[in-house]
Regions:
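C-terminal engagement/docking regions of AAA+ P-loop ATPases
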Residues: 2-13, 252-334
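Walker A/P-loop
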Residues: 49-86
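P-loop (Walker A) phosphate-binding loop of NTP-binding proteins
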Residues: 60, 94, 162
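Pre-Walker A (pre-P-loop) alpha-helix and adjacent loop at the N terminus of AAA/AAA+ ATPase modules
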Residues: 17-63, 245
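Conserved AAA+/SF3 P-loop NTPase catalytic/coupling segment centered on the Walker-B
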Residues: 113-140, 154, 169-178, 190-198
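Conserved alpha-helical scaffold flanking the Walker A/P-loop in AAA+ ATPase domains
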Residues: 44-47, 100-120
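AAA+/SF3 P-loop NTPase mechanochemical coupling elements
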Residues: 108-117, 146-163, 174-183
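Conserved C-terminal "switch" segment of AAA+ ATPases
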Residues: 13-21, 34-35, 171, 185-257, ...
Length: 334
């Protein structure tokens, strides 16, 4: 939400955010005991956590995706659960079910793995649509219904779903409407050579660094509310809107060449998440105000899964990343 009060004391706000965001460095240091490299992935996890959003990670197996969210849950003193999505999984295996007790002749409720602060949905595209939608509904509503009872999910609540971009056989691709519910879609890349050398040494070492809880869930909930206090100037809001509108009407921004390549642009959910992700990025960098670089830093992960490409774009091997890059390089920066 924009701050229209012209007399806003940015200095005070900046000091407050600097003080309240100090825990971010502690969290990063703790996670880095287990994770070498993958700075972007860890930053995006923190953005998802602070922005009350969820993250879709795409990458081949073995890139520390599971380890990252597990390490984060340990450092935050939160509960963690992992759901391995398979073709025979049922919605009840995710959200929970009613169990009949023959002795007492009554039903009792068994809560599913979705009742945790940090939920890893591993290979989400391996389960049928009804299972995917059960999880995505829980993500959206922050509550689930088992039988005739509705249960609120634990706060904070972060879902990190993974999918393998290589193996597409026997998978159920997420529909556009479902993918849009993820705040960010992050493509995880291989580590650099020197990072991988450190990974080998760390895994062959007999000394194991255990992750200690350095932040409480209460601190995270306070930080989630503080993110809204990060100041965003009207010029930055206009910049965000220009970027989003450029995905819908590229010809109005002198990008006529993109019109035949884009089948649909980002929805208002894209605008909301871009503004929120920029605020979160400013917060984790200990700043009480948003600058254009914050928007440019997160835009690819916010819009990657929100822009539809035409067959023509696919034939020309044009990716959404290419489209976003062109838009960012063209739209005027305030």
């Amino acid at each position: 939400m924009s701050d229209t009060n012209k007399n806003v004391d940015l200095g005070k706000k900046d000091e407050l955010i600097k003080k309240e965001s100090a825990f971010v460095d502690l969290l990063s240091m703790e996670i880095n005991k287990k994770i070498i490299g993958q700075k972007t992935m860890i930053e995006r996890l923190l953005i998802g956590l602070l922005g009350k959003g969820h993250i879709l990670l795409e990458g081949v197996p073995g890139l520390a995706k599971t380890l990252a969210i597990n390490s984060l849950s340990n450092a935050v003193k939160g509960s963690f659960s992992r759901i391995q999505f398979t073709p025979d999984l049922l919605p009840a295996d995710v959200i929970g079910t009613m169990i009949y007790n023959m002795k007492s002749g009554t039903f009792s409720i068994k809560q599913g793995p979705v009742f945790a602060n940090f939920v890893l949905a591993d290979e989400i595209n391996r389960a049928p649509a009804k299972v995917q939608s059960a999880l995505l509904e829980a993500m959206q509503e922050k509550q689930v219904t088992i039988g005739d009872k509705t249960f609120k999910l634990t706060d904070p609540f972060l879902v990190m779903a993974t999918q393998n971009p290589v193996e597409q056989e026997g998978t159920y691709p997420l529909p556009e409407a479902q993918v849009d519910r993820f705040m960010l879609k992050v493509v995880v890349d291989y580590p650099k050579l020197e990072e991988e050398q450190k990974i080998i040494n760390m895994n062959l070492s007999s000394k194991e660094d255990k992750i200690k809880p350095v932040v409480t869930t209460k601190q995270i909930l306070t930080a989630q509310n503080l993110v809204n206090e990060v100041y965003m100037d009207e010029k930055i809001e206009k910049y965000i809107l220009d970027l989003i509108f450029c995905t819908r009407y590229p010809e109005k921004y002198n990008l006529k060449n993109l019109s035949p390549l884009i089948s649909f642009g980002a929805s208002p959910r894209g605008s909301i998440n871009l503004a929120l992700a920029a605020k979160c990025y400013a917060f984790i960098n200990h700043r009480g105000y948003v600058i254009p670089e914050d928007v440019r830093e997160v835009i690819t992960d916010v819009l990657r899964h929100r822009i539809g490409l035409t067959y023509e774009a696919e034939a020309e091997n044009v990716t959404t990343e290419d489209v976003i890059k062109q838009i960012v390089n063209t739209v005027e920066v305030p």
